[in-house]
């Protein structure tokens, strides 16, 4: 589905991503883990052509998308749920969701309505609050809104950047359960950047560990959970 080959990203003289390669297969949940500053968010932004790549390539279903505009990448089926949610606070919930459909081809009103109903089915709380301003929602509800917005164009792969950031523990569990549901019921593929390694590895099929811009370890979620170095560094186990 998604293949990153020797990706390099630089901000000025600082090389944030140093030639990483990874793959995400159809209907997989793949976790990209690491400390702050490891290059996780830069990797996702690089896929979307939002960060300055100076080396490597990105392939979506075998097609080289490295030089495409962000809008073209989205239309080809790859979406990003950004860190911090980035909703429109003065738009209603429904208007925020419709922004996810912005740029869709004319004449797809029926499909747009179906997509909206699908999102409301997945997130009933958003249906209840569809006339409410996005900025008045709780943190968990805003995260649901950001994820729902990404679903409006029916992407094949969704990249999520720190979806549990700043949420209460009970909401974290809800968000991760919803991520699983999106994969299982909607057949979506997910690349998940997350500092909550424990929860991420509970739902992921595979994972990669990123340190200072390089992948230092990869394996199945079970292999990473049982790795003593990973347990000590990321799972809080001595």
Feature-to-residue mapping (PLM):
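Glycine-rich phosphate-binding loops of nucleotide-dependent enzymes
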Residues: 1-238
